Amino acid sequence: FWAFNTIAGRAAVDEVSPLLVVSVRWFFVSILLTFLCRKELFETWKVLKYRLKWLVIMGLFGFTSFNSFYYIAAHDTIAINLGLVQGTMPAFIIIISRIWLKEKINIPQLIGVIITFVAVLLVVSSGNLYALMKLQLNKGDIVMIFACTLYAVYAVGLKKKPNIGPLVLLTFFSYVAFIGSLPGLFYESFTSNLVLPGIKGIIILSIIIIFPSFLAQIFF
């Protein structure tokens, strides 16, 4: 399901502006989840209102910010690079777990981190050591690395989640994500960078809403 995000993110270039994608994405996901979890929302809020800071940080880092930088990066790099950089996310999660939670990195994890980065470098350079030495990251790649770091913080933060079902928790995250996306959408509008979707853009948005936004998050 995550793969749809990479493909749709690139397809959205020139069809719908990146920050509009984020706002529309979480607006419709929040409506869908509210309907599905309507019976649990009130009781869940009784728990989450005491974890409001955690809820806001998680929603902003893992959803609003990650998605915003992801779709911005898609304008400056190719889908393969997006997928490759995103493939390093488990390594970022291990590193941030060490920094934030002081978790020890065991030998298999360390080997996994090394293999992940080496594999990405080999693919990017086509196995050519000389090409690797001359490798230059473009703007989109750098933005994508930053986006993955933000999502890694979110993934590690999930270890501190209260005893709440994943679907209803995702519902509250989607509220934060949508509200948090509005300043970016306003900025995009006021700077004349807003691109409204046509038929193709609507199809792309629908794919993003259903697969990486809803199904992928639930299974994650």
State where each predicted segment sits.
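Specific transmembrane alpha-helical segments of multi-pass solute transporters/efflux pumps
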Residues: F1-T6, T34, E40-Q86, L122, ...
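Glycine-/small-residue-enriched transmembrane alpha-helix faces in small-molecule transporters
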Residues: F1-V24, M133-K160, I179-G184, I203-L205
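Juxtamembrane C-cap of transmembrane helices in multi-pass membrane transport proteins
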Residues: F4-V16, V21, F28, N67-T77, ...
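Alpha-helical transmembrane segments of compact multi-pass small-molecule transporters, enriched
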Residues: N5, F28-L32, V85-I99, I114-I115, ...
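Transmembrane alpha-helices of multi-pass small-molecule transport proteins
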Residues: E15-S65, F92-I93, T149-Y154, L170-S189, ...
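Specific alpha-helical transmembrane segments that line the substrate/conduction pathway
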Residues: L20-I31, Y70-L110, A147
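Hydrophobic transmembrane alpha-helices of multi-pass small-molecule transport proteins
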Residues: L33, V56, I105-G127, C148, ...
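Loop-to-transmembrane alpha-helix entry segments
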Residues: K46-Y50, G83-Q86, I99-L122, K134-D141, ...
